[in-house]
Amino acid sequence: MSSELMFNYTFSWPAGPKDVILTGTFDDWRGTLPLVKTAKGNFEITMPVKLANKDDTFQFKFIVDGVWCVSDSYKKEHVSEGIENNFLQITDLVETQEVAGASRIPEAGGLLCGKPPRSAGPPSTSNRKKNKRNNKKRRSKLKKKSTKNNKKSNESLDDNEEEDGVTGTTTEDVTGTSREETPLAEPTNVSKEAPGNFHILPIDQSADTTQSNGIIGGPGPVLVPNPGEIKEFTEIRDVDARELNERLNKKEEVPEPVAGPIVESSVTEKSPALPQADDPIVETKEVAHNVQELTPQVEAVTPLINEPEPLPTPEAQISIPESSKVEPVEGSLQSKLVEKRESTEGVLDGSKKVENKAKKDEEVFTLDPIVNKAPKLPLTDEQTAEGRKSPAVSEEKEKKKKQEKGSKEVKRSETSKEKKPSAKEVKKQTVKASKKQTASPLSSSTEEPKKKKTGFFGKLKKLFK
């Protein structure tokens, strides 16, 4: 066993500073043991102090907020070169030494934990006196509340107490006797303990290790050093739900006006319907087609004129303007033209019909230059007018008109037998016929009233009128 001496000693520093560190020969003056701040505000720490012998001293010093200083509550020692330190001797350690046998916490640098158990001994008489006083109080209460029947029970209690006084024991004294029977704990010497059993935890000086909670129950409120710089403490937003919804809805409605392509597509969709207005063009094509069909007939008629191709003689020149040779050609052409005009009356107006007539007449009489007869003279306007106004031609036309009218009247009589038109319908038909005659006075002589189509739907309309 070594001759080293070890004692537990509590170092303290008064309240005021933020950080206090203990250093000395035990850690080669490195400042590795900070003091703990208590609830009172002062700093304390209990640690084992080793002495090589009785004459040896324990030198130490305090580092308060980074400044090395000496405490006035401990002995001071001047070292060479004007350095001053605190120190402890064996006498100082023995005075503060606690009872042997106290348990230590090695993780806390050998700090004491609790006091040794109380040594067992004879029971004290103070417990008996207290029990007797309590019993007397109980008696007085029971006497006030009890009746005659309860007096017997009180007497029995008195008898029991007298017996307890004779024996000198109570229920509590029994527990004391059991404590007496327990063996005594063997006292232990602090000097016999191994010196290297206590561990000192290394501490980083850069860390602020002295921060402690002033409130025992918890950490308490946090006080921020710069509350003005934190946005959460200054900025407060009051948002109105209605205004926010209106603003968001307005932003969403902005893309709705950008529906330009949709409008253009509608225009393009409607554009194909424009050709419907060009229906008259189709009608003119049909008329042109009908005219083209007439040209072969006219060409077929021309050989009648060009059958004999003799040399030009004065007799032939005189025979050309005769109406007898031209009459059958004109009559056949006019009859065919009249029939085809009747088929196209429902489509073309009166003005168009007159124009088409003039064109067809010109085409018929412009065919004369095709004949390869040099000596023949072309017909003049006067001769053509005389041919048209000839009585033979007019008589034939009137006969044909009468025949056509008779056939149409027969057909109408047959249809009228099937359908009995009302007086209103007859009036309407007469009014329409008069309107047609007034609209086209030139064609009234050659054209006949249009034949009405009588279909199923037409019959229904007439019935509902």
UniProtKB/Swiss-Prot annotation:
Listed Pfam families: AMPK1_CBM
GO terms of molecular function: DNA binding; protein kinase binding
Residue positions, PTM Phosphothreonine: 182, 295, 366
InterPro entries reported for this sequence: AMPK1_CBM (IPR032640), CRP1_MDG1_kinase (IPR050827), Ig-like_fold (IPR013783), Ig_E-set (IPR014756)
Region (Disordered): 107-227, 247-276, 298-465
Ranges of Low complexity composition bias in the record: 166-177
Biased composition (Basic residues): 127-151, 451-465
Cellular component per GO, a single term: nucleotide-activated protein kinase complex
Source organism: Saccharomyces cerevisiae (strain RM11-1a)
Residue span of region X-DNA-binding: 160-161
Function field: Cruciform DNA-binding protein which exerts an enhancing effect on the cleavage of cruciform DNA (X-DNA) by endonuclease VII from bacteriophage T4.
Keywords: DNA-binding, Phosphoprotein
PTM annotation: Cleaved in the vicinity of position 160 to give an X-DNA-binding N-terminal subpeptide and a non-DNA-binding C-terminal subpeptide.
UniProt gene name: CRP1
Phosphoprotein found in the keyword field: yes
Any one GO biological process: signal transduction
Acidic residues compositional bias, start-end: 156-165
Name this protein carries in UniProt: Cruciform DNA-recognizing protein 1
Phosphoserine found at: 153, 156, 271, 319, 343, 394, 440
Cell membrane in keyword set: no
Intrachain disulfide bonds: none
Residue spans of biased composition, Basic and acidic residues class: 337-363, 385-398, 404-428
Similarity section: Belongs to the CRP1/MDG1 family.
SUPFAM superfamilies documented for this protein: E set domains
